Amino acid sequence: MAEHLASIFGTEKDRVNCPFYFKIGACRHGDRCSRLHNKPSVSPTLLLSNMYLRPDMITPGIDAQGNPIDPEKIQADFEDFYEDIFEELSKYGEIESLHVCDNFADHMIGNVYVQFREEDQAARALQALTGRYYSGRPIIVEFSPVSDFREATCRQYEENSCNRGGYCNFMHVKEIGRDLRKRLFGHLHRSRRSHSHGRSRSPSPYHYRRDYDRRSSSRSRDHDDYYRGGSHDYYRGGSRRSSERHRSSYDSDGSRRRHRSRTRSPVRDGSEERRAQIEQWNREREAAQV
């Protein structure tokens, strides 16, 4: 019996534990779910809920004023965000992977998953980010049970064949460009190869492009000093792309320090029609499995 329960744990056959929360760390039912959400007390993976606000979050491809948005601008906005959050999170440890959801369902939209190499690194990040703000919005961060993103991501989406679109309950991971990925993660991979060949290990990859201004006596800062909160008073941007194009802030008091001159994306309200559509899709899925 114990072996049977262990074999079905976190699967659709498990009637006690929620399989979606186990695989994805998020469930469309939230606290109303009839199955248990076993939240880990420690994990190398963190979930930052609804953190990314895309410019077309209300209607895909359309801004808040009803005007079409160039897909290249949407991607540029996303890569600014991705680089910004990578650089902030990398202060606390070595990042194995960083994923941002492209889903539209309320429990998935804008979710950021970061997996550190060690659990204690994730714990440091959790402690540092709790109670802080990003672009005037509180950061909602918690340990996530996700350990294998292959089980959490939608394979049909990767093949451009998901018929549920943005309301799929599995992760639709928004991709960054090859150049940015190489710049952010390339040094990490080179450092590991060097270590595996017995050479002295390179300096920790999450310090590879930054100087940290730890001075706290003066409130007058260069315009590139745009982070506030946590253990460091300010974070000095060293990347040309980040310092010149992206001005997002991590604030400890909720005050806004906007990035660039963009109008902030409006907060997305829940839609009864959209929820009904999601419910219908899930009923169809459950019926197909019977």
UniProtKB/Swiss-Prot annotation:
GO CC field: spliceosomal complex; U2AF complex
Subcellular location(s) per record: Nucleus
Ranges for domain RRM: 44-146
Keyword Ribosomal protein included in the entry's annotation: no
Compositionally skewed regions (Basic residues) per UniProt: 188-200, 256-265
Molecular-function GO terms, alphabetical: DNA binding; pre-mRNA 3'-splice site binding; zinc ion binding
Start and end residues of each stretch annotated as Disordered: 188-290
SMART domains, alphabetized: RRM, RRM_1, ZnF_C3H1
Biased composition regions of type Basic and acidic residues, renumbered to the chain: 208-255, 266-290
Zn finger intervals (C3H1-type): 12-40, 148-175
UniProt KW rRNA-binding keyword: no
Job of this protein: Necessary for the splicing of pre-mRNA.
Name of the protein: Splicing factor U2af small subunit A
Gene behind the chain: U2AF35A
